[in-house]
Amino acid sequence: MPKVFPKENAKHQYEPIYAFKRGMKFRVFSSYGPESPDLDVYIQRKNANNEWEKPQKIMGEVNSKKDEVYPFFDSENGYLYFSSKGHETMGGFDLFRSVYSLETNQSSDVENLHFPFSSPNDDFFYVPDPANGNANFASNRNGKLAAIQTYLV
């Protein structure tokens, strides 16, 4: 896989994380980009030759003036889930979602998932599992330094 924005990410010692299913023709991820000093959410699509095209910043309300990280697009219900410090939060990174259109690259108003999903600590990487009616996310809400736990809800 080609690196995206290698100069910008190297400057911050950051490596984007991708979460997508095999065979998908797109991927969403957070990255430092050429237009912003903060982490923003991008989409990258595969072309007809099965090569990754240039990433595009997600348009609309998702990206703020602070960091957005760990995005996941649920194509079954059209929601883009992500964590942010830049929208109205309970503290740290909170979990958010926005209706997102792959066709127009446009996101709608951002919705905080609130407690019990978001907490005063860092909560991130919300991944729904519609087939089983649950979701997973990670958090350091237990208060232990550098201790991250995953939750099934």
Give the positions of each predicted feature.
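Short, conserved micro-motifs composed of acidic
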Residues: 1-153
